[in-house]
Curated annotation (Swiss-Prot):
Family note: Belongs to the class-II pyridoxal-phosphate-dependent aminotransferase family. BioF subfamily.
The organism of origin for this protein: Pseudomonas putida (strain ATCC 700007 / DSM 6899 / JCM 31910 / BCRC 17059 / LMG 24140 / F1)
Cell inner membrane among keywords: no
HAMAP family: BioF_aminotrans_2 (MF_01693)
GO molecular function: 8-amino-7-oxononanoate synthase activity; pyridoxal phosphate binding
Pathway: Cofactor biosynthesis; biotin biosynthesis
Pfam families, sorted: Aminotran_1_2
GO BP terms in the entry: biotin biosynthetic process
N6-(pyridoxal phosphate)lysine: residues carrying this PTM: 236
Alphabetized SUPFAM superfamilies for the sequence: PLP-dependent transferases
Protein name stated in the entry: 8-amino-7-oxononanoate synthase
Known role: Catalyzes the decarboxylative condensation of pimeloyl-[acyl-carrier protein] and L-alanine to produce 8-amino-7-oxononanoate (AON), [acyl-carrier protein], and carbon dioxide.
Length: 390
């Protein structure tokens, strides 16, 4: 029969790929309550520990008192409030660009930017490991769509030689499932030499990379000429919600006119923008957060490598432990949970077949002692997978 959803769901269960939503019963933080169980969490993207920061909460409360709780309309009607505008100005300053444009989600920002910039007769080239929202944007744009080998400037160059029309090269800044950095200097050189624009989604780099937290573009010392289109999200290191596109005056004005996900949606609550303004202030001022996070990353990598765990080449808070088999990844996640630790198993189709993993994420809110607890639990649990295979 048509729409045999039960069969599709059963097939996913049989392949150990069925997803379920854990119920969070506490605020974000290193220690959470999930499905009634108190756990030490290593799976949140709250990289700087700002999601439950008292000053950010107070800013939201004050914003609700001053501006109410609803955006009321789209930005182009009567939904563009003063706090929205102030956030855009703060983001432009943080990223060193003339303008920034606020979107309600990262998915919308990626779809909006790509579909506004390229269409039929144009070309969009993407890293094969890009986030789903980037791939969807490329497919929806109607442009000729192709993917180059992961983080491979030579592969990109060969595809650029066959490009037609306006050409947009799209890459994650930090790859969300591997934690590695895009080779932006090389990609920018290749794109510029062939007259293409480079678009970078820095969802996981903003706040964690760069001296001021400006992200991967600041990390590599690049500018708007190297990366004309910069995307960032506010629900990860910033600890609030939303996203933005930053670039030239002409780029932002073009998105206001042509980016459908921006035009045809109600603006985010202005009180949320008030909270984001405070989180951006803390992100820049409290540099100790990035310094402490970097120390935790070193601690985890050194400890995991001593155990012989298979890590990715990641200098970021994303530290995947590659298992391979989906059932085994789920088993390791369950073993850790039995010991009071929450580490999510990531399986296909989110990652390529045969590369299921535990995606460990670290936060500036974690302590060295908590990271050591994770390492101790891994040392106890990981060998049980090998014993099961024996």
């Amino acid at each position: 029969m048509a729409f045999d959803l039960a069969a599709r769901l059963a097939e996913r269960r049989a392949a150990d790929l069925y997803r379920q939503r854990p119920l969070l019963e506490s605020p974000q933080g290193p220690e959470v309550v999930v499905d009634g169980q108190r756990l030490l969490a290593f799976c949140s993207n709250d990289y700087l520990g700002l999601a439950n920061h008292p000053e950010v909460i107070t800013a939201w409360q004050a914003g609700a008192e001053r501006w109410g709780v609803g955006g009321g309309a789209s930005h182009l009607v009567v939904g563009h409030s003063t706090p929205h505008h102030q956030v855009e100005e703060a983001l432009a300053e943080l990223t060193g660009r003339p303008r920034a444009l606020l979107f309600s989600t990262g998915y919308m920002a990626n779809l909006g930017a790509i579909t506004a910039l390229v269409g039929q007769g144009d070309t969009v080239l993407q890293d094969r490991l890009n986030h789903a929202s980037l791939l969807d944007g490329g497919l929806l744009s109607g442009a000729r769509f192709n993917r180059y080998l992961h983080n491979d400037p030579a592969s990109l160059a060969s595809r650029l030689d066959k490009a037609v029309g306006n050409t947009l090269v799209v890459t994650d800044g930090v790859f969300s499932m591997d934690g590695d950095l895009a080779d932006l200097p090389a990609l920018a050189d290749v794109a510029r030499a062939r007259g293409a624009w480079l678009m970078v989604d820095d969802a996981h780099g903003l706040g964690t990379l760069g001296t001021q937290g400006g992200g991967i573009v600041e990390h590599f010392g690049l500018g708007v000429d190297d990366v004309p289109v910069l995307i960032g999200t506010l629900g990860k290191a910033c600890g609030t919600a939303g996203a933005f596109v930053a670039g030239s005056e002409a780029l932002i004005e073009a998105l206001v006119q042509f980016a459908r996900p921006y035009i045809y949606t109600t603006s985010q609550p202005p009180a949320l923008a008030c909270a984001t303004l405070k989180s951006l202030e803390l992100l820049r001022r409290e540099t100790w957060r990035r310094e402490h996070l970097a120390a935790l990353i070193r601690q985890f990598r050194e400890g995991a490598q001593q155990m012989g765990l298979q890590l990715m080449d990641s200098p970021t808070p994303i530290q995947p432990i590659v298992i391979g088999d989906s059932a085994q990844a789920l088993r390791l996640s369950r073993l850790l949970r039995e010991r009071g630790l929450l580490v999510t198993a990531i399986r296909p189709p989110t990652v390529p077949a045969g590369s299921a993993r535990l995606r460990v994420t670290l936060s500036a809110a974690h302590s060295e002692a908590q990271v050591q607890l994770l390492l101790n639990a891994l040392a106890e649990c990981y060998p049980q997978l090998e014993n099961a295979d024996a």
